[in-house]
Regions:
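Leucine-rich solenoid repeat scaffolds
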Residues: 151-167
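N-terminal capping/linker segments that flank leucine-rich repeat
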Residues: 2-46, 184-186
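Ankyrin-repeat boundary/"N-cap" motif
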Residues: 26-33, 57-81, 101-111, 132-153, ...
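Short, intrinsically disordered, charge-balanced linker/junction segments flanking boundaries
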Residues: 129, 133, 191, 207-209, ...
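Repeat-mediated protein-protein interaction surfaces in helical alpha-solenoids
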Residues: 4-20, 49-68, 89-93, 191-196
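Conserved ankyrin/ankyrin-like repeat signature
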Residues: 44, 90-91, 117-118, 161-162, ...
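Ankyrin repeat domain, specifically the short helix-to-loop turn at the C-terminus of the second helix
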Residues: 47-63, 93-101, 120-129, 167-173, ...
């Protein structure tokens, strides 16, 4: 079976196992175009896409060496999303200048980059924020609920400056309903980001998640209070 898988991979790319140990240690997409994007080599990138007539709206080719869970979960990551993820500002600007679509998903990729400059670009171009997947409109029906998706992704990444920005500017306390507060606390607990956790908040919204994510000592301690 292993031989069959190896042959299938070789059929897709004859040099896929070149420098195997080094690529496996790096844990990143080994394609040339992805390497250029990560390094923000804009001149080389422009020359490459022009020479090869490469579609600027195309998706990156998945790699067996990729280890980042966010990228792995998204099989349709585009060139501009990949540049946003790595904070490659020059290539991002080039793709934007060439009219590549600025999709709502870019917010999540930019949050991972921790680039305030890219956040500002999305705002300047009025890029819509992403909504929660598999959630009906009625579940998060308060004003600016789209920003809650950005807030929870910031919490996941431990990019608390971004989390503060989204909460203080777009998710005012009086606008939050219990489901929104619960979503924030759930992500804090799940991703071990304790920046927003307070005892009273946990008591009100977090007991289930303490138990779910195996915070047994804290769960028992609060239960006794």
């Amino acid at each position: 079976k292993m031989k069959t898988v190896k042959n299938e991979l070789l059929n897709k790319s004859s040099n896929i196992f070149d420098n195997y140990d080094m690529k496996r240690e790096e844990g990143e997409n080994d394609s040339h175009i992805c390497s250029m994007i990560r390094n923000d080599s804009v001149e080389e990138f422009i020359s490459y896409v022009t020479r090869s007539n490469y579609s600027l709206s195309s998706q990156i080719t998945p790699s067996i060496y990729e280890t980042n869970s966010f990228i792995l979960e998204r099989k349709d990551t585009t060139l501009i999303e990949y540049s946003a993820f790595f904070g490659s500002i020059q290539i991002f600007q080039y793709l934007m200048m060439k009219g590549v679509e600025l999709a709502a998903s870019l917010w999540l990729y930019v949050i991972h980059s921790n680039s305030a400059e890219l956040i500002h670009m999305l705002e300047t171009h009025h890029v819509l924020q992403p909504k929660f997947e598999n959630k009906s409109e009625t579940e998060f029906n308060r004003p600016n609920h789209e920003y809650l998706r950005c807030l929870t992704e910031s919490i996941k990444c431990h990019h608390n400056d971004f989390a503060d920005y989204f909460e203080n500017n777009f998710l005012f306390q009086e606008e939050k309903d219990p489901k929104q507060k619960e979503a924030i606390i759930a992500n804090c607990i799940k991703y071990h980001n304790y920046y927003y956790l307070e005892t009273e908040t946990i008591k009100e919204h977090g007991f289930f998640y303490l138990h779910l994510y195996k915070y047994n000592e804290l769960f028992n301690l609060l239960l006794k209070e």
